Swiss-Prot record:
During spermatogenesis, may act as a lectin-independent chaperone for specific client proteins such as ADAM3. CALR3 capacity for calcium-binding may be absent or much lower than that of CALR. Required for sperm fertility. A motif (Prevents secretion from ER) lies at residues 381-384. This is Calreticulin-3. Residues 198-294 are annotated as: P-domain. The gene is CALR3. It comes from Bos taurus (Bovine). Component of an EIF2 complex at least composed of CELF1/CUGBP1, CALR, CALR3, EIF2S1, EIF2S2, HSP90B1 and HSPA5. It comes from the Eukaryota. SUPFAM superfamilies: Concanavalin A-like lectins/glucanases, P-domain of calnexin/calreticulin.
């Protein structure tokens, strides 16, 4: 007896009890998405988004997402959710992106923002916690960005992670784990993983300079002759004679000896002092707030530039459960990726057929025009 198949949606429902889903967006309620997503008005020239499944798709409704609509524009849009901290938890960021226009230069990445981000004024200078996703420009840049904000600086992964460059929908997943390991997946397949400390070159941030520090006056010039440099110095070995009488002889002073051989411009002997090297100590800040932990995550958004528009963003997910993310990816992108390619193949065949028919028509017209010219030539020759 064959085992009964459990639908993917049922698996996802079961996982909800175990997973914390901070944000999930599939754009299945038509134009109501506008109540959740906020266009930035920071610049009147920002491009606009529309809800679309594109020219080819696996499912007309399920594949609808935010599509860029204007060429050579910056775009800025975001959605809020209940703020949370990923301290001590796994953080998964996942979404699909489709460069239907065959991207030549532009971003396809997303950003996670602090809860206090100003959505109406979102722009390229707005602070973000994480930037993740594909970026394409010409032949040189075809990369997956993974940028983390730490200690008021942005740190990029030092590894080169190649993105997909075709016009189909692809599933991008970033996993940040509390043991300071990470994983990047495309279409459910792991393409890069490793240590957050080493792959972001953050090991130096695990230690900080000790505040106590250099000897007093260390940074003052100590080599050159001082202004009070004298030719003579007191004889420290001299002692007052036993028959010295202060009442008659006055106050006794040690004899002054000449510094041999003194010349103007002579530099006194001393110890060369290099730059003071601070001792290194463990950065106590990191014990409370680690390299991939963010205290107040509260918004997700698209802030990017595109030369040629047409990209579609869909199936956004932010959660703490890797299995839930995997099942969600299968239930969304996994269900429509095949039909999408089938529709594209059908359209391609139709385009080829149409082009062939047009070529045949052109050839027939060309033959007729050729005969017409020959007839005219014949008549002209007859005239002679």
């Amino acid at each position: 007896m064959a085992a009964a198949r459990v639908p993917l949606w049922a698996i996802c429902v079961r996982r909800v009890a175990l997973a914390t889903v901070y944000f999930q967006e599939e754009f299945l309620d038509g134009e109501r998405w506008r109540n959740r997503w906020v266009h930035s008005t920071n610049d009147s020239q920002f491009g606009h988004f529309r809800l679309s499944s594109g020219n080819f798709y696996g499912h007309k409704e399920k594949d609808k997402g935010l599509q860029t609509t204007q060429n050579s524009r910056f775009y800025a849009i975001s959605a809020r959710f209940k703020p949370f901290s990923n301290k001590g938890k796994t953080l998964i960021i996942q979404y699909t992106v489709k460069h239907e226009q065959k991207m030549d230069c532009g971003g396809g990445y997303i950003k996670l923002f602090p809860a206090d981000v100003d959505q109406k004024n979102l722009n390229g200078k707005s602070q973000y916690y994480i930037m993740f996703g594909p970026d394409i420009c010409g032949f040189d840049i075809k990369t997956v960005h993974v940028i983390l904000h730490f200690k008021n600086q942005y740190h990029a992964n030092k590894k080169s992670i190649r993105c997909k460059v075709d016009s189909f929908t692809h599933l991008y997943t970033l996993v940040l784990r509390p043991d300071l390991t990470y994983e990047v997946k495309i279409d459910g397949q792991s393409i890069e993983s490793g240590s957050i400390e080493y792959d972001w070159q953050l090991t130096s941030l695990k230690k900080m300079e000790k505040a106590s520090a250099e000897a007093e006056g260390w940074d003052q010039a100590a080599k050159d002759k001082s202004q009070d440099w004298e030719k003579h110095f007191l004889d420290a070995s001299a002692s007052k004679p036993s028959d010295w009488k202060g009442e008659l002889d006055g106050d006794w002073q040690a004899a002054m000896l000449q510094k041999p051989p003194y010349q103007d411009g002579l530099k006194p002997e001393g110890i060369d002092k290099d730059v003071w090297l601070h001792q290194k100590m463990k950065n106590s800040y990191l014990t409370e707030y680690d390299l991939s932990e963010f205290e107040n995550i509260g918004a997700v958004g698209l802030e990017l530039w595109q030369v040629r528009s047409g990209t579609i963003f869909d199936n956004f997910l932010i959660t703490d459960d890797e299995e839930y993310a995997e099942n969600f990816g299968k239930a969304t992108w996994g269900e429509t990726k095949g039909p999408e390619k089938e529709m594209d193949a059908i359209q391609a065949k139709e385009e080829v057929k149409k082009a062939q028919e047009e070529d045949e028509d052109d050839m027939l017209m060309g033959r007729f025009r050729g005969r017409e010219n020959s007839f005219k030539g014949f008549h002209r020759r007859n005239e002679f």
